[in-house]
Amino acid sequence: MQLSGFSTNGSGSLNTIVCEKLLFKPNFVQDSFIIGMTILCSVILYGSGNLRYIDALLLASGSCTQTGLQPVDLTQISIYQQLTILLFGVLSTPITVNLGLTLFKLYFYNKRYDMVITNNKLRMTYTYHTVRRRDTPEPSKVGNRKIRVLLDQGNQMHRPVAPETKAEEAEHQENEKHHRHHFRLRKFANAIDRPSFFRGNTMPALPSYAGVRNSQENEDRTEALSPALGKRRMASIDNGSLSVVQNNARNNPVDFYIPSSFEESSFQTIPEDFEPQVHDHENQTQLNHHLDNNSSISSHNPSLETANDGNQETVSSSNSNYSTTRVDNDPHVASYSPQNSNFDHQAAATTNDAHQNVVRGSAITIAPTPVPRHNRRPIYFADDTNGAEQEKGAHRLDGRGRKRGKSFAVTPTLHRNERSMSVLPFQLAKSFTSALPRRLTFNRTHTKASTMSLPYLSYNATVGRNSAFYALTPVEREELAGIEYESLRILTVILVVYFLFWHILGLVAFLIFIYTAKTSGRVVTDGGINRGWWAAFTSSSLFDNLGYSLNSDSLNSFQKAIFPQVLGTILIFLGNTFFPIMLRFIIWIMIRTTRFSPNFQQALYFLFEHPRRSFTLLFPSKTTWVLFLNLTLLNFASFFFFMVLDLGNSYVDKIPVGYRIMNAIFQNAATRSAGFTVVDLSQIAPAVMVTYMFMMYISAYPIAMSIRQTNVYEERSLGIYAADTENDDDNNINNNNNDNNTPKRKNFLMDHIQRQLSHDLWYLFLGYFIITIVEGRRLESEAEPQFTLFAILFEVISGYGTVGLSLGYKNDPSLTAQFRKISKLVMVALQIRGRHRGLPSALDRAVLMPSDKNFDREEEDYMRRHGKKNTNRADPVPSS
């Protein structure tokens, strides 16, 4: 929970000099923010009247630090002052502060990497069109010519072809009447003019092969069914998308089919010297050849092949999954099947029909060559041969040096799983074209729950502890910044929705409760409080852990109201201690349920794998589980002590067992953060008071230790560089040295705890000492038995732990209300100091702005830990 120092590049307004000279401490900005908000809130409260300034200052500090110690009864101030306290408390919560930091970081990323972010937006827009769902409507016409697209028909998916409707059959019969006596070859020549370069020397002529393949003996081997075309040569096109642009309208319908295969008997050979006599020069055939810059054309590139029987021309690729066929006969040719199919009788029937003089409107068939079922995925996974080796230290994202690592490749040129495009109409080609590089190798990351595969980066990056990326070139850092920017955008949306959802849910639930519960509603109205305002104030105070209540006895009046205690417990946990756990759980759910776009999934998974690069309160998996176990044990221990140590207590025994259990659960949740009470703490067992005092002091420890343990720059401030859990290939550390890592890690944690104690104890007891001096006379007086050393120590620890519990004083909500002015000033100082004890000892990577100085720090830390020289490369090395 912090707002640390930040820096930008040298040209920014907040440059490195400002960070090093003015913001020389990591909590400088946080202190300035909280102190400024406290002073501003106190001025507003004091200006509204009915308050002394010292009380206004104490109320403001309690609101901005989420302490909640009340110097006055809130029912004695105006609603405007109550609203001011509530708003300043909401704006100062850890969630809001870190949300503001995320927005601030987004601004600087946008400023420094504007071109990279713009390209990412264009790529996301492009990807949306290329990978859109198949159920979106396709173009219905090219000019005035109808289009019909049938994907994955016939034998490839082992599904029968959908029968034609009555309207389609009537249309086919009408076409047969008009075109029955026309010549097939003349009709073929008039339909679509072939590109000029097919007949010229603009592209090298390659031998053509059979146009249609089928699987007969082996699924992995295919053979040609039609004879070669002699001198008619077709150009080889590698990994391209060919789009046919037809500029004029035609009256003949155009149908697009994807047949599985064709029988050999249905093909005839076009004469070698055949040349169409009628050409429509308005029809242009354009080839859009999309090739990657850094990829080379293989000599084994797929070729375009043609085969004709006088009625059809087939353009296919030997390695491609698609072929384009000109069809002038019955459309049922799309349903032809190989010999081992269940539809052999359909193939025989259609073969006989092909020799008849039944001619219908011209049609274009886009036919994929048969591919075995186990080879149909466009991306194949290859197990890493070295993935089983347990390496130590910084790992590489190419799957070669990672434990449980695998890699998958997208290879649009040479592999059997490619999806290269053949000649397509313009409206279809723009949906299928792809801007992927010729070969991309990505990392396949495994988690304990399941295996998910998403691309990270297009280069091999060295990653150390706490997601620190080392030895990156400027170009590679820009690519990394683009992914980080997208992850920050997603995180911002998650935080806003999370924050608003629980506020609205709490408000609606408490409104329903307070207007339907007769006893509880009467308690609120008897205190002169509006029910609707009570619901809004209480729900927000619970989720934001303010600890303020409009009732003078906190929530003691609702001791037997189950619903507000259950909902209040949930809001307290999710608004503070369990927030990091819930945030990671939400991201985990989104990864498995959302399917927006590949870029969205990539950024979301990057946020899941490298949380501490983006957000202070988002931790890796292991740290999150440790935090969950610690919080569970602490809450169970507090609940156990309340139930056991209060046995025989006259005050607690009066509470029925069922309500007592619910009171123990709620009080346990409020003791470590919120500061609400449902029982009178001054009447419970002394041992339970000591337990609560201990819980208030260590309230910040679980999250603070998680932050510091996962901070990249923490080791720099401590001078202790913990070894990586997994070292890279260059470290050459054997497995025997792994035993030495455990003591180092224990020393690392123990050093944190010792520094935290030295940070807390002297300040805490100094404040306690000053208050005992100021309140000495009252401590000695027998007329005020509630003024005791233990009560003051309880109040001091409650203020320093920003909890807000108090043993009370007669009719006042807290003992602080009876302190003198100097003692109240000490309490303000304790609250502000305690608000920052969750800060790390050094700048946090999650709040640092991108700058060359911060990049140099990462390289320096890498060299200190591994004893390596700077390995920055001049140019990025594309993976292959």
UniProtKB/Swiss-Prot annotation:
It comes from the Eukaryota. Residues 165-177 have a biased composition (Basic and acidic residues). Residues 157-182, 289-344, 857-880 are annotated as: Disordered. One of its GO terms (biological process) is cellular response to cation stress. The chain crosses the membrane at residues 28-48, 84-104, 494-514, 571-591, 625-645, 684-704, 756-776, 787-807. Residues 316-325 have a biased composition (Low complexity). Keywords: Cell membrane, Glycoprotein, Ion transport, Membrane, Potassium, Potassium transport, Transmembrane, Transmembrane helix, Transport. One of its GO terms (molecular function) is high-affinity potassium ion transmembrane transporter activity. Glycans are attached at residues 9, 239, 283, 293-294, 321, 443, 460. InterPro entries: Cat_transpt, K/Na_transp_Trk1/HKT1, Trk1_fungi, TrkH_K-transport. GO terms for cellular component: plasma membrane. The keyword Glycoprotein applies. It is a multi-pass membrane protein. Its main location: membrane. The keyword Lyase does not apply. Residues 289-315 have a biased composition (Polar residues). It is found in: Cell membrane. Belongs to the TrkH potassium transport family. Together with TRK1, defines the major, high-affinity potassium influx transport system. Involved in maintenance of the proper sodium/potassium ratio in the cell and in regulating the plasma membrane potential. This is Potassium transport protein 2. It comes from Schizosaccharomyces pombe (strain 972 / ATCC 24843) (Fission yeast).
